[in-house]
Amino acid sequence: MSYKKKRCLKSSIICKNKKAYYNYFIEEVFQSGLVLMGWEVKSIRLGQVNIIESYINNDNLNEMYLYNSIVQPLHTSSNYVSCDSSRKRKLLLHKNEIQYLCNKKNKIGSTLVALSLFWEKSWCKLNFGLAKGKTKIDKRASEKQNEWKKEKLKILKKVKFQN
């Protein structure tokens, strides 16, 4: 009798969009699947993907797409398949989720931004957020808060070592 090995069920992050957290206030975070071609999955497994400038928009009322995400084509991919590295990719969402996102996105200053791409079991998933843009003043304030958090951690470490 043969026993199957249990695969690791942890989700592993492929890439993160750190600029999104710097340029936007993230209000809500959502998760969806992606419709990918075979060569795209192979490239993503190798980590040849970039979602820094990517955003989400709806062409029809029933479908949402990921734009400006770049998946580098493999040099070993076949010749009869056209490899468009920056094509729009369909998101797998329920109809009520799409309607909810469209209503939220129609507010002034709101947009949907890709945050991270990760594996969940054997499926490639996308985390994206409903975001509002930051001004220069907001960016400076968030930098000051981050620096203060780092300073607090340093002080706490010093206090713990002294006791």
Curated annotation (Swiss-Prot):
GO function terms (MF aspect): RNA binding
Keyword RNA-binding: yes
Record keyword RNA-binding present: yes
Entries under Gene3D superfamilies matching the protein: 2.40.280.10
Primary residence: cytoplasm
Location of the protein in the cell: Cytoplasm
Keyword entries, A-Z: Cytoplasm, RNA-binding
One GO cellular component term noted in the UniProt record for this chain: cytosol
A Pfam match: SmpB
Biological process (GO), any one: trans-translation
Free-text function comment from the UniProt entry: Required for rescue of stalled ribosomes mediated by trans-translation. Binds to transfer-messenger RNA (tmRNA), required for stable association of tmRNA with ribosomes. tmRNA and SmpB together mimic tRNA shape, replacing the anticodon stem-loop with SmpB. tmRNA is encoded by the ssrA gene; the 2 termini fold to resemble tRNA(Ala) and it encodes a 'tag peptide', a short internal open reading frame. During trans-translation Ala-aminoacylated tmRNA acts like a tRNA, entering the A-site of stalled ribosomes, displacing the stalled mRNA.
Matching HAMAP family: SmpB
Family: Belongs to the SmpB family.
Protein name: SsrA-binding protein
Species per Swiss-Prot/TrEMBL record: Buchnera aphidicola subsp. Schizaphis graminum (strain Sg)
Organism lineage: Bacteria, Pseudomonadati, Pseudomonadota, Gammaproteobacteria, Enterobacterales
